[in-house]
Amino acid sequence: MGRSLKKGPFVADHLLKKIEKLNDNNRKEVIKTWSRASTILPLMVGHTIAVHNGRQHVPVFVNEQMVGHKLGEFAPTRTYRGHGKSDKKAGR
């Protein structure tokens, strides 16, 4: 179930201020954030946002197709290394 339209999308205040400041100065630089729950807004398009995945900051370049999604969707938190491989030597 989505968020109520009367509430509007959630975006962390500090992140919104940083992006508006960069847009006013027409600058593009990487913005570090821990706010994975923030919704991507149209004013974020074209910026690179480094989203924390619990271990490091993953750079995410925002494009038009990402608008409406959350930042955390583009920074995976788990590394899948595949299921256990069958060891032929152990079977002997």
From Swiss-Prot:
Record's keyword terms, sorted: Ribonucleoprotein, Ribosomal protein, RNA-binding, rRNA-binding
Which branch of life, at top level?
Bacteria
Which residues belong to the signal peptide in this entry?
none
Does the entry feature the keyword Cytoplasm, yes or no? no
Q: Name one GO cellular component term.
A: small ribosomal subunit
Q: What is an annotated GO biological process for this record, any one? A: translation
Gene3D superfamilies in the cross-refs: 30s Ribosomal Protein S19, Chain A
- InterPro entries, per this entry? Ribosomal_uS19, Ribosomal_uS19_bac-type, Ribosomal_uS19_CS, Ribosomal_uS19_SF
Gene Ontology MF term list: rRNA binding; structural constituent of ribosome
NCBIfam families the UniProt entry points to: rpsS_bact
Chain's role: Protein S19 forms a complex with S13 that binds strongly to the 16S ribosomal RNA.
Q: Which family does it belong to?
A: Belongs to the universal ribosomal protein uS19 family.
Q: What is this protein called?
A: Small ribosomal subunit protein uS19
Gene source species: Nostoc punctiforme (strain ATCC 29133 / PCC 73102)
